[in-house]
């Protein structure tokens, strides 16, 4: 079956484009961009981040959760 519509645009790494070398766990506004509305860490295939920065991002989000800067889950009743 042939793919229809426009071809998908290749995702680029946010951190490489903006020349961010280290991801800081205290930068909550940046980390929230990579967390779903349910509080789950978004995968690389969705965000387009490189493997190196995805590992740093995961560690930073987990640290921010431990010291209560980010919630583990959100309650959207």
Curated annotation (Swiss-Prot):
Transmembrane regions listed in the UniProt entry: none
Name of this protein: Small ribosomal subunit protein bS18
InterPro entries given in the database record: Ribosomal_bS18, Ribosomal_bS18_CS, Ribosomal_bS18_sf
Assembly information from the UniProt record: Part of the 30S ribosomal subunit. Forms a tight heterodimer with protein bS6.
Gene that this sequence comes from: rpsR
Gene3D superfamilies: Ribosomal protein S18
A biological process from GO: translation
Highest taxon, organism lineage: Bacteria
Family in the record: Belongs to the bacterial ribosomal protein bS18 family.
């Amino acid at each position: 079956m042939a793919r229809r519509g426009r071809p998908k645009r290749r995702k680029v790494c946010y951190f490489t484009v903006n020349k961010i070398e280290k991801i800081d766990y205290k930068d909550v506004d940046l980390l929230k961009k990579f967390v779903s509305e349910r509080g789950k860490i978004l995968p690389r295939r969705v965000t387009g981040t490189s493997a190196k920065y995805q590992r740093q991002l995961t560690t930073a989000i987990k640290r921010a959760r431990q010291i209560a800067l980010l919630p583990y889950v959100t309650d959207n009743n």
